[in-house]
């Protein structure tokens, strides 16, 4: 009977070893599948990120081109602003000089271009010098545009 118990307990041990081996194999298989799934997910994420990097690079390039264009336009506008400021200043100087000349010469009444033949006095040329023509107004200097 002792021999039968040994055989019975020996087969129990063999059965436990067999179950453990089977369990280990199944665990290893699950680990391999898990690792494979993780690898596939990582590869998918990498390709997705590479695509996003490419899209963002293209957007960045377009924004840089637009920035260059806007900076060029801005430089042109700044230059034009400087020129226009100078032009306005020259016109203001011309108006001031003309007004001073009119004041010193005693002139002041001007005739509207449309009513020049009728001789209708409009008033002081300083009010709207661009709409009036005065015989007493002579440019003091030549202004180039």
Curated annotation (Swiss-Prot):
Q: Where in the cell is it found?
A: Nucleus
Q: What happens when the gene is disrupted?
A: Reduced requirement for exogenous sugar for seedling growth and higher rates of true leaf development.
Ranges of Polar residues composition bias in the record? 1-11
- Residue ranges of the region described as Leucine-zipper: 46-53
Pfam families, per the entry: bZIP_2
Q: Where is this region: Basic motif?
A: 16-37
Any one of the GO CC terms: nucleus
Record's note on what induces expression: Reversibly repressed by glucose and mannose. Slowly induced by Pseudomonas syringae. Induced in roots upon cold and salt stress but then repressed in leaves. Promoted by low energy stress and dark-induced starvation.
GO terms for MF: DNA-binding transcription factor activity; protein heterodimerization activity; sequence-specific DNA binding; transcription cis-regulatory region binding
Predominant location: nucleus
Q: Which domain of life is it from?
A: Eukaryota
Similarity comment: family membership? Belongs to the bZIP family.
Complex formation: Interacts with ZFP7, BZIP4, BZIP9, BZIP10, BZIP11, BZIP25, BZIP42, BZIP44, BZIP53, BZIP58 and BZIP63.
Its biological purpose is as follows: Transcription factor that binds to the C-box-like motif (5'-TGCTGACGTCA-3') and G-box-like motif (5'-CCACGTGGCC-3'), ABRE elements, of gene promoters involved in sugar signaling. Activated by low energy stress both at transcriptional and post-transcriptional mechanisms. Promotes dark-induced senescence and participates in the transcriptional reprogramming of amino acid metabolism during the dark-induced starvation response. Transcription activator of the mannan synthase CSLA9. Recognizes and binds to DNA-specific sequence of CSLA9 promoter.
What is the protein's name according to its record?
Basic leucine zipper 1
Species the sequence originates in: Arabidopsis thaliana (Mouse-ear cress)
């Amino acid at each position: 009977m002792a021999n039968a118990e040994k055989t019975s307990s020996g087969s129990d041990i063999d059965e436990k070893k067999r179950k453990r081996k089977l369990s280990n194999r199944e665990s290893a298989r699950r680990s391999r599948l898990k690792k494979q799934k993780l690898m596939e997910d990582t590869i998918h994420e990498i390709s997705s990120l590479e695509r996003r990097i490419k899209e963002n690079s293209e957007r960045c390039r377009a924004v840089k081109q637009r920035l260059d264009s806007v900076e060029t336009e801005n430089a042109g506008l700044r230059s034009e602003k400087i020129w226009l400021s100078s032009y306005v200043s020259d016109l203001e100087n011309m108006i001031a000089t003309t007004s001073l000349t009119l004041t010193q010469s005693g002139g002041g009444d001007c005739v509207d271009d449309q009513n020049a033949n009728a001789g209708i006095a409009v008033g002081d040329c300083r009010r709207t010098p661009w709409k009036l023509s005065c015989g007493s107004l002579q440019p003091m200097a030549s202004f180039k545009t």
